[in-house]
UniProtKB/Swiss-Prot annotation:
Protein's UniProt name: Probable aspartoacylase
Positions annotated to bind Zn(2+): 13, 16, 104
Keyword Acetylation belongs to the record: no
Comment on bound cofactor: Binds 1 zinc ion per subunit.
Length: 304
């Protein structure tokens, strides 16, 4: 690796328009976001999907970073774009980056939040620094064989900033502002690590992925009930064991069992209907921060 640059990606999904608009404004006004002296590469993840205002053209780009398929030359616009991003800005690319920050929005009531994939020490260090600065909740997504190939996993360190709720395709000033705050906090944290100024909090609070639930469906795949109105909008919240998950058109509740301590996230996210996900379930955990997390991030940024 010849650079510790930072890759900032917006528009990984073409109908998530707020982060691309923010990057366009940043390009026009470099003082809009403090890059903290870092070498930042600003990229639209899926330009064609953004032009069409659709999530993707052939396949979800954020599931295309699969080494085996990329090595075999998998076809389709998004696989080609994934390979191009790695050739340009991957750890050994033409303009190599060590860190990737992927900017997303959601129709779910996730607020301003972070998504971390797995338990790489450098990722956890960056997430802990941002959580310590802004108090953002963290969704730790791991051990889900049905959901793989995420963009940030192809860089040595990476986080997703996820902001919502906002309808697909709608520009919203509040969402843009929250995205900017999250991005600036990430860049500031990386600067502090490089300058030996970073101080990790004592603990990291994560919501660890347990699995996902789909809507009840008939044999033909049509939903028989929808997310319960009292569950809608309750991302990150403790749910009573008696709370119904779903409600049918006639008002009948579907009371499937909750396991104690389960907390929903991405409740009724519009884009996940095609993935047969009505919401995901997590468990809130408090982890002691380990010294090797910050060391891993320091070593990564010092490798330039």
């Amino acid at each position: 690796m010849s650079s510790c640059g930072v890759l900032v990606v917006a528009g990984t999904h073409g109908n998530e328009v707020n982060a691309p608009w923010l990057l366009q404004q940043w390009q026009a006004n470099p003082d809009l976001i403090d890059a903290a002296g870092l070498a930042v590469q600003k990229v639209i993840g899926n330009p064609e999907a953004l032009r069409r205002r659709c999530r993707y053209v052939d396949r979800d780009l954020n599931r295309c970073f699969l080494p085996e398929q990329l090595e075999q030359g998998a076809s389709g616009l998004e696989f080609q774009r994934a390979g191009e991003l790695l050739r340009l800005h991957g750890p050994s690319g033409e303009q190599p980056c060590a860190v990737a920050i992927d900017l997303h929005s959601t129709t779910a009531a996730m607020g301003n939040s972070l998504v971390v994939y797995g338990r790489r020490p450098a990722d956890l260090a960056l997430a802990a620094l941002v959580q310590g600065a802004l108090g953002l909740p963290i969704y730790l997504h791991e051990a889900d064989a049905q959901q793989t190939g995420f963009l940030v996993e192809s860089w040595p360190c990476g986080l997703v900033i996820e902001v919502g709720p906002v309808p697909q395709g709608l520009l919203n000033a509040g969402v843009v502002e929250q995205t900017r705050l999250g991005l600036e906090s990430c860049l500031r944290a990386l600067y502090q690590v490089r300058q030996e100024l970073a101080r990790l909090p004592d603990a990291l609070v994560v919501h660890r992925h347990l699995g996902s639930r789909d809507l009840p469906k008939a044999e033909n795949g049509e939903p028989q009930a929808l997310v319960h109105p009292e569950l809608q909008g309750r991302d990150w919240q403790n749910i009573a064991s008696t709370q119904a998950m779903f409600r049918a058109a006639d008002g009948t509740d579907r009371c499937e069992a909750w396991v104690g301590g389960e907390i929903p996230v991405f409740v009724n996210e519009a884009a996940y209907a095609e993935k047969s996900i009505a919401f995901s379930l997590t468990r809130r955990e408090v982890w002691p921060v380990e010294p090797n997390w910050l060391l891993a991030l320091k070593q990564l940024l010092a490798a330039a």
